[in-house]
Amino acid sequence: VDQRVSVAVVGAGPSGVGLVERIAASAPELFPTGHLTVHLVDPHPPGAGRVWRYDQSPLLWMNSMPEDVTMFLDESVTAEGPVRPGPTLAAWAARVRGSGGDGVPEDLREEFAASTPTKFPSRRLQSAYLDWFFRDALAALPSNVDVVVHEDTAVDVTGGHGGPQSVWLAEGAEPLVVDVVVMAVGHLDVAPTPGQLALAEYAAEHDLRYVPPAYTSDIDLSALQPGEDVLVRGFGLAFIDLMALVTEGRGGRFEQVDGTLVYHPSGKEPHLHIGSRRGVPYHAKPGYRLQGEFAGPPRFFDVAAVERLTAREERVDFWRDMWPLVAKDVAWCYYTELYSAHGERTALPFEEFERRFAAADWGSAELRALVVEAVPAEEDRFDPERLDKPLAGLTFADEAELTEHLHAYVRADIARRADPAHSADMGAFLGLLFAFAQIARVVASGRLTDDALIDDVDTWWFGFFSYFASGPPAPRLEQLLALSRAGVVSFVGPDMWVRADGGRFTAGSPAVPGERTATALVEARLPRPSVARATDPLIVALRDRGELVEESLPGGRTTGRITTRTSGALVERDGTAHPRRIALGPHTSIRAAAAFSRPHTNAPGFRRNDRVARTILRTLHAGGPITIDT
């Protein structure tokens, strides 16, 4: 019998097309006979999806270098499926350049010609890579598997546990009838919180402008008037995008004059007053590699440590149980690089340092004394607590003094992140990447307290990781300083507060006297996930019938994320998992698994896609009842 089965993948961004590539890789082994159709549903182009779509400003950059971006598995990935090797973004761009730029959009040719493995690319270059990756995955499909693209929005999925699923599309009268549905939904679009709604109503009442959290590339910034005072809450990557769009994006230009970057305004820029909890921008992305030996996989927060924590009766607390091990591992990676690449800046034999470091607890007097003894220069010591709050305890006489301090701070950061003499920071960066995977294991065990998961892991840890390891390219911080010198940007300070009163928005910082008033307020960050406030019609339809629920923790708090099993199977209101529905993405119980990755890092997103693709292929080929590991 010619067995015909089908899968719908809702969301054709990097995650969705990564799944198609894994289906292509494993189908010859697991689905040798019969016919499989994969329906790919997304109003945006397959490969890039919404976030990486080509239709966005060329001024928006990636914050990764081309040599650090791949969609392909390599020998580091512990996956059952075959590795189908392929180029990084850098290798692909070089290949395209060598072939005369075939199939490349006309307006990208110049960037292709100038691209290097370590020059930060535009998001549109990544968009072109993702488009090519999708076509490459299609070409790799065996003859009994085909992909049908639907440029449409999925608005509902219906169907019981025992039978086919109907995927309803906004533009289609008839549903797609399939055996399994995968929701690769990316970040959740959400309605404003009550606090944000109140600010929006206040703005409307007083003829002010309020921009709630959102993807910067999706926001209409034209409401921000030339010369208007605009408060910006948030100093991360969303701010950097905003900064580019309202300056260069409005006709201003940067120019190097005698070794200093100068900004020439167009006169159309608003005046940005920026603040945040830390009061400083994210650290520049490092411009170097490790110079010495890598410390290797986690040593203190290793698999055995994770098993010990999750096997206990008592629930796991982040600061008491996990952070001392995480911090010690990251510090170990840092000092291993310092010793192996820059040993002349250390004062104890490595063997002695290693022995005493391993024996001491994080935060103990012994460890502090050891570091002071072994590492004479304070700037060579790793202090994550000080890194996290660089302005803690400081006060400034006025805005001018704060500005002077921040300029010195940012210049020092740019210099440090460009100088291989400080490659120990790259050791710490890799240590953080490894810690990410270990923390995910503890989260998956369900043993964390509610507060540890929501306040410490989902909020503080993700934030600290982004701030230290996932900041903007250094040239963006050069631009920030140039804009400050040109009077387009001002700094509010740390622990920024905002009030809505007197028909204006007012802001300030406990570290700086005085207040700023403005006629616009922009929240420069992504919205927090919330199933309860989701606006995506598919999420809303499933939620309202109890077929998709917000993750709820043992202590009664909710995380805003979509509840799934570790397999990705979608959990319903009665606690059962739907055997034919899977949800993947950053806003599910599984949490972080980036859709593309640095090469040679055994990326969790690649492992997840491989596992899901193989589960689907096995299940559909077996021909019996369909159950996705519920």
Name these PLM-found stretches.
Residues V1-Q56, R109-L620, G624, D629-T630:
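Flavin (primarily FAD) cofactor-binding/catalytic cores of flavoenzymes
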